[in-house]
UniProtKB/Swiss-Prot annotation:
UniProt subcellular location: Cytoplasm
Pfam families for the chain: HGTP_anticodon, tRNA-synt_His
Disulphide bond pairs: none
Source organism (scientific name): Shigella flexneri
Protein's name in the database: Histidine--tRNA ligase
Length: 424
C-alpha cells in the first residue's frame, strides 16, 4: 500500500464544516469594506525576495528567520509573501495607481511564515489587509480604526477587544530616540537576554516588544518614545485621539507599541484580546508614509492594517457562539419512484431560475423517503420539496416545512411562490 501524503506542518486543510463559518465572517467583513467605499485588489502569492527585504527590513525576524525563500529555474530569488503591504505597494507603483491619487484598497488571502505552529498562528495563514494611499491627515487613520470597530460590532466581539495606540514619530525623531534607547540598553547590557542583545544594534525598538519579564521590568526606566516626538507627529496623534473620542471608541496609549516591521511611522495601533488565553493581537497596522518612495515610487502618504483570519475565527467562536454559519442548503428536493428523477431535476432547475440566491440540493443516489429526509436534516435544509410518481403524474409537488412539520400539496407552477413565502 502506498504511503499517505499528509499536509505540511503548520499548513492546514479547512473542511466544509469549517469553511461555512469562514464564509459568513468574510462576507461580514467585505460588506463593511464596501460600505466605506474600499475596493479589492488581488496580488501574487510569490514576489521577488528583494521586495520584502527593502520593505520589511533586513534585520527583522520576518526576513531573517521566517520567510519561505527559494531560487527558481532562472536563478531568481523568490519568496512566498509573508505579509501583504509590500506587494500592494509594489502593484500600486507598477500600475500607476498611487502618485497624486487617492486609493482605498483591500486584499485577502494566504500568507506564509516559517514560525512554530500554535493555536491561531500557522505557517500558512490567512490575512485581510486594508491600505489607503494619498491621504495624510489623522482623519483617515481614525476612519480605518472606526471601520475595524464596525467589524467587531457586526461579529459580536466588540466587548472582547481593546484598542492600543501609539505614535512612533517621524523617521528623524525615531532615529534620535533610537540613539537614546541604545545608550540606555548599553548601560544595562548584563540584564538583556541574547535576543535583545542582538536587536540592540540591529533593531533596538524591537527590544520594547520583548516578552521577557526581566527586560520589561528594565524598560520601565528606559527613555520614553513620546518624549522624542516631533511637533507635527504630536499634533497628528492628538488629532487622531480626539476623533476616536468623538466616535466613542475607547483606547489605551501604549508607548511600547512599535510594530514588528521597519516601514511604520507616526500612528501605530493594535486591537488585542484576552479571550483566547494569553493576550493576542487580532488586528494591527499604522502609517507608513515613506514606503512607496523606498520601493521606487514618488513620495506618497499611506496607512493600513492587517488582520489574521484564523485568530478572528477562533475569537468569534469563543465569545459569540450565536454567530452561526449560514446553512449549506435551504431547500432539499426529495424524489422517489422509477420515473421521477428527470422530473425532479427539471423542477430543480426551474426553481433555481425563479429563486435566485436560494440554495437548493437535489437528492441523488436513491433511498426511501426516510433516508432522503435524513439527508435533508444533515444539510440543514429548512424546506423539502417532495416528488413521487403521483405528484409527477398530477403536475404537483409536496412542500414540507422541516421545522414545523407542516406540508402542502402545490401545483408545480406555484412551488416557487410558495417557497418564497416559507423562506421569508
Amino acid at each position: 500500500m502506498a504511503k499517505n501524503i499528509q499536509a505540511i506542518r503548520g499548513m492546514n486543510d479547512y473542511l466544509p464544516g469549517e469553511t461555512a463559518i469562514w464564509q459568513r465572517i468574510e462576507g461580514t467583513l467585505k460588506n463593511v469594506l464596501g460600505s466605506y467605499g474600499y475596493s479589492e485588489i488581488r496580488l501574487p502569492i510569490v514576489e521577488q525576495t528583494p521586495l520584502f527585504k527593502r520593505a520589511i527590513g533586513e534585520v527583522t525576524d520576518v526576513v531573517e528567520k521566517e520567510m519561505y525563500t527559494f531560487e527558481d529555474r532562472n536563478g531568481d530569488s523568490l519568496t512566498l509573501r509573508p505579509e501583504g503591504t509590500a506587494g500592494c505597494v509594489r502593484a500600486g507603483i507598477e500600475h500607476g495607481l498611487l502618485y497624486n491619487q487617492e486609493q482605498r484598497l483591500w486584499y485577502i488571502g494566504p500568507m506564509f511564515r516559517h514560525e512554530r505552529p500554535q493555536k491561531g498562528r500557522y505557517r500558512q495563514f490567512h490575512q485581510l489587509g486594508c491600505e489607503v494611499f494619498g491621504l495624510q491627515g489623522p482623519d483617515i487613520d481614525a476612519e480605518l480604526i472606526m471601520l475595524t470597530a464596525r467589524w467587531w460590532r457586526a461579529l459580536g466581539i466588540f466587548e472582547h477587544v481593546t484598542l492600543e495606540l501609539n505614535s512612533i514619530g517621524s523617521l528623524e525623531a525615531r532615529a534620535n530616540y533610537r540613539d537614546a534607547l541604545v545608550a540606555f540598553l548599553e548601560q544595562h547590557k548584563e540584564k538583556l537576554d541574547e535576543d535583545c542583545k542582538r536587536r540592540m544594534y540591529t533593531n533596538p525598538l524591537r527590544v520594547l516588544d520583548s516578552k521577557n519579564p526581566e527586560v520589561q521590568a528594565l524598560l520601565n526606566d528606559a527613555p520614553a518614545l513620546g518624549d522624542y516626538l516631533d511637533e507635527e507627529s504630536r499634533e497628528h496623534f492628538a488629532g487622531l485621539c480626539k476623533l476616536l473620542e468623538s466616535a466613542g471608541i475607547a483606547y489605551t496609549v501604549n508607548q511600547r507599541l512599535v510594530r514588528g516591521l521597519d516601514y511604520y511611522n507616526r500612528t501605530v495601533f493594535e486591537w488585542v484580546t484576552n479571550s483566547l488565553g494569553s493576550q493576542g493581537t487580532v488586528c494591527a497596522g499604522g502609517r507608513y508614509d515613506g514606503l512607496v518612495e523606498q520601493l521606487g515610487g514618488r513620495a506618497t502618504p499611506a496607512v493600513g492594517f492587517a488582520m489574521g483570519l484564523e485568530r478572528l475565527v477562533l475569537l468569534v467562536q469563543a465569545v459569540n457562539p450565536e454567530f452561526k454559519a449560514d446553512p449549506v442548503v435551504d431547500i432539499y428536493l426529495v424524489a422517489s419512484g422509477a420515473d421521477t428523477q428527470s422530473a425532479a431535476m427539471a423542477l430543480a432547475e426551474r426553481l433555481r431560475d425563479e429563486l435566485l440566491g436560494v440554495k437548493l440540493m437535489t437528492n441523488h443516489g436513491g433511498g426511501n423517503f426516510k433516508k432522503q429526509f435524513a439527508r435533508a436534516d444533515k444539510w440543514g435544509a429548512r424546506v423539502a420539496v417532495v416528488l413521487g410518481e403521483s405528484e409527477v403524474a398530477n403536475g404537483t409537488a409536496v412542500v414540507k416545512d422541516l421545522r414545523s412539520g407542516e406540508q402542502t400539496a402545490v401545483a408545480q407552477d406555484s412551488v416557487a411562490a410558495h417557497l418564497r413565502t416559507l423562506l421569508g
